[in-house]
Amino acid sequence: MKIPDNFLYYLSLHEDCNERLLARAGNLTPEELEVCIHPEIARIKRMVFAVLGEAHRMKAFVRLQPLGARVLYGFFKPRHKIEEHICDYFARRNAGIIVVLGNGSECWISLCLEGRIWRDHGSGMAITLEKLKTALHCSEDESSEDRSNVEGLWQVYYDSQYCPERKNLAAFKRHMPRRDQEAAGLRLVQNKENVTLDNFSSGE
């Protein structure tokens, strides 16, 4: 993994980042951070990579579900402070759709319109979704049906990816650690034979 030019941004999102580390890193170029072996600089590099890694995995792991036609939401409780970053990512990929990521205590809201991002930070997911459902006049039947269909498809996909019989299971677990599964609200089956998504969808 290469150190990005905006590595200070990712460093600032690390759970253990502070002003002193940011000031120290601010005197470095990406190239210097890449090759320097000083203990503190090496730590900064690890912190940047930790945030980049979690952000990369969460983009793949977070499951978005519809609330009517104008809202997508998903459970999200990461280790680092990447909530707004990931919410904006999904908003850009779903322009014109309100994206809500969060958990029982707080949530992040992003909307991309004409290339601009509008953001908000709310309380728990349930309260925020209820407010959106009321404001957008989403019917309970419509929301429940959409949610059920999407939950089923996502679970089928993730189940099909988790196969203990994989030849390189250790590598798979490194890329999909349990901590990240829980951060994205995933529930993976533990004892499935090596089958495809089509097999799961057809009930085989």
Question: Which role fits each region the language model picked out?
Answer:
Residues 1-204:
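Extended, well-ordered protein cores
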